[in-house]
Amino acid sequence: MDNLQWKYDMAGIKSAREQGYRRKIVARDISVSTGAKQYAYLLPPMYNLFLKQVHEKRDKNLYEVIDEKSPVRLYFDCDSFDRDEGGYGLDLDCKTSLKLFHDLLKNFILFLNPNSTANMKAHITRCIRQDKPNKHSFHAIYPGIVFKNINELKMFVLSFAYHLFEDKNDMRLAFKKQGKNKTLGRAFFDLAVYTKDRCFRLPFQSKKGDSAKLIPLREITLEEIENNICQPEDFVRKPDNVDTSIGDLLSAAVMEKYTGVKLSTYVRAYQEGVIKEKIKTKCIEKRNGSKKIKITTPRLEIEWDQMKIPGVETVEIREDKDFLQYFDPVELRGGFYSLYIHLLKDICYFLPDEVLKQWMGHTNDKKANYLIKSNRKKGAEYAMTGGYALELLAKIYGRCNVRDLRDPIPKPTNSFRNTTRINVTPDRWRPIEVSDMKKFFIDSQVRDLKTNTYNDCGMITAMADVDYGEKIALSKKLKMDTKKKCQFITGQMGASKSTGVMDYMVFSMISSIIANAMVIVPRCSLAGQTVKKIYNTYKEMISDKDRMKKIKNKRKIVINPYFSQAFTIGGLQEIYDELTSEITTTDTCGTICVCVLNSISKVRSHVFDTIIMDEPVTCVDNFYIDSEKKQKIPVKNILEKKGNTIAVTDLMIDMLMKITRNANQLIFIDAAFTEDVIRLCETLYWGAYTMQGTVDDWRKVLENEGVDQSNIRHKIKRIKDENILIRKWIQNKKEWNYDKKTDTRTIISTTEIDHFRLFRPIEYICVYDKKITRPIYTHIIKYDCKQTMMNKLLDDVREGKKLVVYCSVGKETASIINTINSMTSRECIVLPKVGGVTAKSLKGKENQLDEYMRSMEVVVVSSVLGTGTSYPEEGLFDAAYMFCKVTYGTPQISDMIQLSARVRATTTRTLHYHITTSTSGHKPNGDALKNSDYHGISFKDHLDKTYTSRDHLHRVHMSRPSLASEFMRNELQQSFGHVIDETLEKKLPTHETNSEIEKEKHSDGKRKESKMAQEIDKHHPDVYTDVMATSNRNMTDEDGTKYQTIVRHCVVRTNNTTEPDRTMDVDWDSSQGTSGEIFHRPVTVDRSRITEQLVATPGPSTSRKRKLSDDDEYEKYDSGIEDIETDVDEEEEVQNKL
């Protein structure tokens, strides 16, 4: 129809209709070879004119598009074939088959509803093909039976097929089908035409390039033409006014009789009958009364250019309520309802009810009101930013035209330098090669053992609860004769920091250099791995007999795991039993305790010579999280719950400080120390002696911080009292003069030792390994689009690469696994092993983790994998991917970087990552925008400040994507920088974005093509080139005049090619066509970089699509499902008239 606007593609149609725009849609063929179509809306004023033109046969290629959510009449698409010599087709002729089908349909309806009064009059059209006289095609429509939507109709038709063929009530309408698959069968009525947006041919219409039309069996008037349409215009525009009572009764009966039956959309034919087969479809479950039915619900993209929302070119949002003036609620509800709902969910957080109701027009929209109420409850704890509304405006008006002029989230007053990774330099950190670590520690311990001055021993002076004599006796009894000291050990990830320390600890324990030790780790899974690592190191050492001969006072060791469900981890019970069984009553043994911070109260002894804390900041984070979750007492009052949490926290802190106070040596290991963490650990080392400096110094510090005088006086008094208590334990160092003649001693001088000398200066050590020739990742690629990175991941899976994927969200893990499995099941012959490591899948299977990781070809892991777990094997995986989402409740960026280093050596040494932040994040309060001064506060205060600062930084990243992206880039490069030698200089990995790589590839391709074009022009001037470049060419006109022209190179054909290729003409001339002339459009033939336009001559032919065999096994997807009832007696008479 020329008066229709054929400008919509199907994407635009789907988008508008999905958002609630209800109009009848028609389609027409525009291509012979591909079957492509154009679509148009059929508005009410044009509907009658449309029916008139269809009745007058003015158009040839029109279809109606079946709307999925609108009522639809019962319709069938039937095909029958006369039986041939190969057994293909029906034994019945077309008239008998049609009558039999109609009778079986009547019987099935009465089977479902014995009291049915349905009008069974059918309107049938028939298509006769001259090139295939044995094929008979019918369309049958029953106007008296209307279903609520296409899904209920599909359930009815599939149940009808199940009743006939699966229950074998009547097998006469099922037959074998010709083609490659001889067992593939089909039914008289097609079962595959009840899909979304199905194009159903209208009466008197033919396909493009074919003259075979659908002709009614009896003559119809203009008033009757609408009975031959499946969905009249008012069915789509006013669905509530359509009577679907008969269809509802049939649907209810189908649900009752066929609930739980797996229905199929095609059949298989064998000698004994027809067997159904299950088809995999993407669907969701919806309830229909008390029953569940499955319907397909594909998600559609929004065509933003179709949205017409009133506004101006430049959008300025100065207040929250300004959002509403750029959105018309009536337009959104009518055409884009899902956008309307999502917009309400976003802006309802910060707009009052009165404003929203006034904007909504006080409509009684129950769904919208319910969503507003429920989403306000969910977001009551934090404020939203209106991110979805801003994004919607940006897509409609353009990102550069939308300005958010509201009070912005306050910028941080500093760069959170105390919360970011420190820069390791030789002036502060002492470089030590990993192979020299044990020697360094052992030599230090041996020197300390030769020093027996107890008056400045840190372990003694730290014990303030006993007198001096008891401290000396206790220190001698435990052989803790070393001075109190502390070491911070850092280095690049994979430099064997923890392994070196464990090696030193085990050797010192065997050699009786240290009495006992405690290892504190962040997680239970890592604690189990630490126990096994210590055990293996111990066994390896005692098996070296030459080495053991050099040790005089050898001891055996016992490893005690103190953490929740310790002995449920495979192998720990056996290790403990083996070590304890080797110890007799006469043996002296050393004890190594391995625990997590939360389980420190389970430790029986409170005196350990050496304390080793691995990943201290992760210990702190896990401790705070678990202390809130592990409340076994049911608490109804929130204040009581907080009180219990504080009590648990204080108890753990007191236990930790008591153990570290009694220790002689503290070792902290981390690959990414921050100033906050260093100060926290230093405070733990100093213990009660944290208060440093004179009273005047403290007064100046407090005044500079703006503390009022009353608080200053209170703090100064507390400092004085604490200094007095400290000075009570300061001993006087006396120098004596001994007189041999008189055998007397006199004091020469007395020197007071202040508390600064009770502890050794802290040592900062950076470990490097010369054996490591390159870092974990040498190349880091950032993807701005998540889908682009997902496509790259799927390409690697197709190529058979082994991949490890890190995710910050558990749901993301499941989604990626499902996507990979879906792709591989469709495209891969050999399916790869794809698995996931989450908290749920890992529970109770911790001992199988290593074997599971090594057996998978694609493994998707979440943060549950934990810090400290590592897989150093070269080539275990080919590449790594990281999906990082920064939002409430997800791991922090630094934690995700630690997670991405669990696999130490991928084949390509490449990390692909994508980072996204929540569009509705928290607005950080004032405390999150400044650093606190930690000078002179207690360990508990340090602990709270460290945790709070990290949490505040995470919230700032949530609300500032650019800051989060920059922080991620810097942290990745610093974390995976390779320390080369004792200079501690880092060789940083390269960092690129995917867009930069694609741009560079495009530029390289341009340069190569340009060079190739120049070479071709130089050596073969008679050839046009097909590369994207230009050059000057000398040309000669017909009269001999020479001139120069710029030619776009295209390797197509040589200049001396005179005869065009007539291959397509020969094919068309030899094809079997139907009656009438067929005019084909020009066809482009691509044959190995040769491009020519071939224009076909008019003549009898048929389209390439129709030339394909109708016997092909995939025809079931193209034909359609239809049923028919009719008065067939008039058929021959009508055909003679035509």
From Swiss-Prot:
| Family annotation (InterPro entries) | PRIMPOL
A Gene Ontology MF term for this entry? chromatin binding
Instruction: Please list where the region (Disordered) is annotated.
Output: 985-1015, 1094-1138
Q: Acidic residues compositional bias: what residue ranges? A: 1110-1138
> Superkingdom, according to UniProt?
Viruses
Protein's GO biological process: error-prone translesion synthesis; replication fork processing; response to UV
Disulfide cross-links: none
Q: What is this protein called?
A: Uncharacterized protein ORF49
- Species of origin reads Ostreid herpesvirus 1 (isolate France)
Q: Provide the organism lineage as a comma list.
A: Viruses, Duplodnaviria, Heunggongvirae, Peploviricota, Herviviricetes
